[in-house]
Amino acid sequence: MSNERKTEQLTRKIFKSLGYYDDKNVIVEEQISDNPIIQKLLKSASKKGSGMGKPEFIVQLLSTDVLLVIECKAKTSNHKSAALDKFAEYAVDGAILYGKYLSKEFHVISVGVSGESEETLRISNYLWIKESFSPIELKIEKICSKQEYLSIIKGTNEKKEYDIKNIKKNTKAIHKTLRETIKITDELKPIIISAILLALSEKSFADSYNTATTPKSLLNLMLTSIRNKLESIESMPEEKVKIMMRNFQGLESINKLSSNKKDDKDFLNIIEKVKTEIWPFINTEHSFDYIGEFYKEFLSYTDGNKKGLGIVLTPNHITDLFCELANIGVNDRIIDPCCGTGGFLISAMNSMLSKTDDPQIQRRIRRDQLIGIESESKMFTLAAANMIIRGDGKSNLYNASCFDKEIFTKVKSTHKPTIAFMNPPYSQTDDGGSELDFVLNMLNLLEPGGLGLAIIPINCVCSLLDKEVEKREKILEKHTLLGVMSMPTTLFYPVGTVTAIVIFEAHRPHNSQIKSWFGYCRDDGFVVSRNSGRIDRNKKWEEKKALWVNSFRNREEIKGFSILKAVTAKDEWCAEAYLQPDYSQINEKKFQRAVEEYFVYKALYSSRFEEIGEEDAEA
């Protein structure tokens, strides 16, 4: 006769072997928890449809928001059902049900265990990310240690997406407090956040900031901690320290931050919010540019047109895409000549670090292989802080124009970049000229055979005006066009810039007889959400990215998506010009979308159409 108690005893034995019972930061409970939050969540989670849910085991990993919930069945034939909806009869089904209820407040590992002996034991694991709608099946057939489970959760795309969603939500809340309570100026908003994050990376400040009695003494403590942090960095040039400190000291001009009122806790509360709501998400393995996210949030409340200022920050999934397109290796040296808040460099660093476990190589990557140039002093400060917080041991950033001849020579000879990524400032004249100047300069910085990738307005590669054709000719005289990807029209939502990614091999003149690859990458799977911006709601991005990357790398021609074409500077560099329409795929919805995209494009670049004139149009 089957006996479920045997299965439970085997589970206890596994817990004991993994140290669960001996770990003071782990609580193993059976059927009922003393935790009032868990009690409340399981109040109506019965497998029979009503009443209290009572899992065989509830494991709390203290100091985290992670739970394990385990359901046992004696017979392996009762391990799991095909539809996972027979909660009372099957181990996995029941564990998933409990996980659904508990995931309102926790990340939950739902574990189904069946069998009455070690030889017949079956174990399945499913992960519920907090506030998610469905679980993820983990291809793991054992109960893992606490650290293994935490690492598994941390490494999932779903957990990263959850973290990003929370960073964005917390960013909005912190910005609201800065705007309404501290009344800080627009230009200093991102500065104060980067200052707080940099100061919190100093243990002495993180442990003592709440002892400051006034806003002024707290600001002084923060600035002193930042200076100590910067001066402790090996080979950090004094000039860079001065530039950064000059920008951080600009916070002294804010009345609320220079107050001697002992009962004014607003500044302290901001630091507390950053520490509790942002800092926990920060680690050197995460490619999300959180300082860039703050910057974008602040821009949304800034007077004036963001595109008019030339400010268009690159979405996180696109900076990661660049790394895959370039197939970055641990020995590559990456440069971004217009690095902004450092988004491309962060993604490149994480891509390289993920490819080696050697501490010496990882240290070399952080210290020597990431180079950035940024002309705007405050933006330079944000980028430098961003990299330092992530363990960049040297911060090879230059506060200068990438066109500065002295800087150009120094960077090229000292760092010898092999890969370049760039999202240059976008021209306010819609003529596409200035962006192509940046592209040429970027390619000239590279070592022979290096790869240069840039995301630029699509009119730079499609315009047939003499000015733009001449600039493209200058590029092709020295460098080979490998490929162009036409990007989604809403990629930079709410800014209406329509873009393309260009990919070049440096210092190999373009052969117009050899075909380049063109991809119609208008659909990345993201949708526009009123409150969250563009999001991968339907989880399509990974599949789309694989298609884009593999098609480019393998130079594949896919009907309706990609094509190989030999081009010169006088041709249009975009898939739309050469792909044959697949009429079988056209329906009313797609036709309407195409018309809408055309009107967006024409509205954005109407001045270019007018400049071409009737005579050119007829030609």
Q: What would you call each of these model-derived segments?
A:
Residues N25-D65:
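Active-site metal-binding core of divalent-cation-utilizing nuclease and nuclease-like domains
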Residues F57-V59, V66-K80, Y98:
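Conserved catalytic cores of phosphodiester-cleaving nucleases, focusing on short active-site segments
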Residues L62, S77-N78, K86, I136-Y149, ...:
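A conserved structural/catalytic subdomain of Rossmann-like adenosyl-cofactor enzymes
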Residues H79, K165-I184, K273-W279:
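Short amphipathic alpha-helical segments and their helix-coil junctions
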Residues S194, L198-T302:
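Long recognition/docking surfaces used for binding and targeting
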